[in-house]
């Protein structure tokens, strides 16, 4: 009987990179195709759980009553998207993350393991 490998859940937070309004049509097409290829491969390998870009508008809330403390409109360090993946361990999740197309445009990936609850 084969031993079942338990996969762990990881969150990838995408920040920065070129703003789409600063890209040429060719850059936008290449970037889009790179993302679709990468995500398609993750889906094929059953590693992609969910992932979406985020809209530009948003608010940072704080305190007991959720007071508005910030807007994201001009913040270049704002999270622009996220992805949830499954991997055997942190090393595999890191390897997967290193293939992210955001690096081609100067962006970053924050990789976090989800805690068991």
Where are the regions that the model predicts?
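Conserved, structured core segments of small domains
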Residues: 1-117
């Amino acid at each position: 009987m084969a031993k079942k490998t338990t996969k762990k859940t990881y969150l990838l937070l995408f920040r920065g990179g070129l703003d789409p309004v600063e890209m040429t049509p060719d850059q936008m097409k290449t970037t889009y195709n790179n993302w679709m290829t990468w995500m398609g491969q993750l889906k094929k390998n059953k590693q992609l759980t969910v992932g979406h870009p985020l809209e530009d508008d948003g608010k940072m809330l704080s305190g007991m009553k959720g007071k508005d403390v910030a807007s994201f409109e001009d913040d270049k360090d704002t999270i622009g998207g996220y992805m949830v993946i499954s991997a055997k361990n942190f090393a595999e999740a890191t390897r997967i993350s290193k293939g992210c197309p955001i690096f081609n445009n100067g962006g970053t990936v924050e990789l976090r393991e989800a805690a068991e609850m």
